[in-house]
Amino acid sequence: MNEYLTREIWKMRKSIKTEAGTPVVSLVKVENKTYQLLFMSCGCENACTFCNYGFDYNLTVEMVKPELEKIDLKEIDIVELELEANGSFLSEREIPYDLFLEVLRFVSNKNIPVITMETHYKTITAKKIQEIRRILGQDEEIHFELGFESVNEDVRSIYNKDINLTEYLEVARLCERYGIGLQINVLLGAPFLTREEQIQDCIDTLKFVCEKMPKGTHAVLFPINIKNSTMLKHWQDIGVYDQISSWEFVELLHRIPEGYLDRFTIAWWGTRENAFTKGIIQHPKTCEKCRDRLMKFYVDFYCNWNPSYRKKILDEIWATRCDCDK
């Protein structure tokens, strides 16, 4: 990571305050039958230019277990449950090891088809995977969602992402050996790139994920959101960056080859706030005329994985692109 960027980003994050009374853990509906179990941990130890993960609680089993016991997962129709911390769920700095095991025991035997854990690739070890398999079982479908953002090293440096590609692929193969599926985050909207360069970077990255990662790996494509107390917001304030159009995200989706259309999902396309976002202030730009239509399209795309259907609705919405993007 860049020392200057990292230092300045950590200064910004110190100004982020969690609202008094915020639960240490909460169950949040994402979309359809996907839910997140969110833990207000002490904050990510990395320093991406677009993230505003601040400093929350130094979690312990004694602090979290009583709150977990108030959540009845069996009463909710959940297809996928995402385990998320304020950065990385497998980070022992954020989720102490005994708490990690307690959470696994809590979600086990709840008849949840898919359990996903969002974490930094450097937090994944064979020991942790073995514990996950021991507690959740060999037949449970388990995914890790990993930050990646771009296959291009120069673009990752703009994001201040600390990734070694060789090590990243080694971790991916480790996960494959234990039957852990991967969801790889791909980000649209890198600062200092043109719109065309931003789109092409995402297409190149999706191609890398599909061709170089283990079979069955999926990408998660999402447009960048400008949040308070981030370097991205600072760059906007001094006039060197502005939020992308929601139609740029549609254009990216429309240009993806049909053979890849069932290899990714989408996220963060519109207004979405929870205890962890600290207030997203700018999601992709739209106008009043097209906003509702776009939000409906994104939900439809998110909920349907059939490539032919996705291509159909992409062709339809791109053919009626709003004047606000022309």
How should these model regions be labeled?
Residues 166-230, 249-268:
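Conserved C-terminal portion of the radical SAM core fold
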Residues 54-71, 75-96, 110-125, 140-168, ...:
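Core AdoMet radical
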